């Protein structure tokens, strides 16, 4: 049965960073489009390696997303690891580890696995201290994308049936993107290429991997004050509960 994957059970709480009542296993979400890059002195915020990466980014949105994810990860370190409270931001560095297919943050000799996601300006970050099987994904729900055509080309037949069953375009889109974020999250949790998880039935794959999944949708206002809907899914070990916080502000 697949109904529970569509019940929007993932906890997403809107809050300010200063009021964050942070427990472990938390995912921070933030609209990076609200960042003004000129408000930040990048050499103070980013390591020399990170500076080379952000300088390669061409679009302002890509720069905003990169800066936001790195700053959020570093503030998470300071909140969850009191011994690093006074460590300068530019002394922490994020680098992708090819062997594990994980983005890792290097902090005073410690190496911590992370997970990030971004879609159309909305970013999310989490720290995975115990290196457990965990992944999450964010995706903008777009009615303009040919999601039915994409599903029929890439998805499992059972998934296609779930997508085409609803009679409204919105419901079909919601189902398509929920399945998509579950596949992406599973790929991150298991360090498998997403290309290997497109055609298999994601619900069977989750069951075989003995992993849990929960999801929800959130609405964020864009620069024109239009509401944009995003789907968020988390895949994790059954013994661990994750929750999300949508931040309304940012630390400078």
What would you call each of these model-derived segments?
Residues 1-252:
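Core catalytic alpha/beta fold that binds nucleotide/phospho-ligands
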């Amino acid at each position: 049965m697949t109904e529970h994957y569509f019940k929007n059970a993932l906890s997403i709480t809107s809050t300010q960073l200063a009021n964050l009542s942070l427990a472990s296993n938390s995912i921070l979400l933030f609209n990076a489009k609200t960042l003004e890059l000129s408000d930040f002195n990048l050499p103070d915020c980013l390591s020399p390696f990170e500076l080379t990466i952000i300088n390669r980014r061409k679009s302002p949105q890509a720069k905003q997303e990169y800066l936001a994810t790195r700053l959020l990860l570093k503030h998470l370190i300071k909140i969850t690891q009191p011994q690093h409270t006074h460590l300068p931001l530019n002394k922490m560095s994020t680098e992708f580890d090819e062997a594990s297919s994980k983005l890792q943050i290097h902090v005073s000799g410690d190496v911590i696995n992370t997970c990030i996601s971004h879609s159309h300006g909305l970013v999310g970050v989490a720290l995975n201290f115990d290196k457990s099987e965990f992944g999450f994904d964010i995706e903008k729900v777009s009615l303009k994308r040919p999601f039915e055509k994409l599903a029929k080309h890439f998805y499992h037949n059972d998934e296609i049936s779930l997508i085409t069953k609803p009679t409204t375009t919105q419901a079909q889109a919601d189902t398509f993107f929920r399945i998509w974020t579950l596949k992406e999250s599973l790929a991150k949790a298991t360090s498998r290429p997403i290309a290997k998880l497109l055609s298999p039935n994601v619900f069977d794959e989750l069951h075989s991997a003995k992993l849990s999944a929960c999801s929800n949708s959130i609405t964020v206002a864009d620069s024109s004050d239009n509401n944009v809907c995003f789907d968020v899914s988390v895949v994790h070990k059954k013994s661990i509960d994750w929750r999300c916080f949508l931040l309304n502000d940012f630390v400078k």
